[in-house]
């Protein structure tokens, strides 16, 4: 499993980084039978443009949205346009996993009617226990944020990583972090006003 940090700015994109977006890749097979599976953890504002530096955005197999704040999901709007109106024609739908209401949230962000919204470009699923995408096994875990939010444990190729999403310290974060090889963890909302 390989990780590329596409963007990690909090709340809004910065001059050198878009908002949250993490690319995970895992290989299956060898030689001519080799296939690279790719998933995105979040697709925050500014991330779609930066993603081009690493992979063709049309090669993404699934998108996992941790929660509905713009810095974690807003570039789904641009991705919708890319998949719907690409010069090679409309692209087949890919799975998008997220909290309840993800399909409605991204449709509203683009001022689309909720029905059909973006359902012809994306196959929306609500987190409800573990699931697989190619070689990846994903376990979504609720975390502590002002809105419904999830962190997750992602396993592939014998390794497990954790992604906190946005959260305060909580039991869910402890579960995400337990015995992982790598933990991507939010670091904000400090107790003091002094920043390092």
Task: State where each predicted segment sits.
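Binuclear metal-dependent hydrolase catalytic cores
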Residues: 1-164, 168-170
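Cap/insert and terminal regions of metallo-dependent hydrolase folds
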Residues: 168-196
């Amino acid at each position: 499993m390989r990780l590329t940090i596409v963007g990690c700015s909090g709340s809004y994109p910065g001059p050198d980084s878009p908002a949250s977006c993490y690319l995970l890749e895992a290989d299956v097979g060898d030689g001519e039978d080799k296939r690279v599976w790719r998933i995105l953890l979040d697709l925050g504002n500014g991330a779609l443009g930066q993603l081009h530096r690493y992979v063709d955005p049309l090669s993404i197999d699934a998108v996992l949205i941790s929660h509905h704040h713009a810095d974690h999901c807003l570039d789904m709007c641009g991705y919708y346009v890319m998949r719907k109106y690409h010069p090679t024609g409309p692209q087949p739908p890919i799975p998008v996993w997220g909290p309840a209401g993800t399909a409605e949230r991204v449709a509203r962000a683009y001022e689309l009617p909720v029905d059909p919204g973006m359902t012809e470009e994306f196959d929306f699923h609500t987190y409800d226990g573990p699931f697989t995408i190619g070689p990846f096994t994903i376990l979504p875990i609720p975390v502590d944020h002002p809105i419904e939010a999830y962190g997750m444990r992602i396993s592939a190729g014998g390794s497990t990583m954790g992604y906190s999403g946005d959260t305060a310290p909580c039991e869910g974060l402890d579960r995400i972090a337990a015995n992982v090889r790598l933990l991507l963890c939010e670091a904000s909302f400090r107790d003091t006003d002094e920043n390092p």
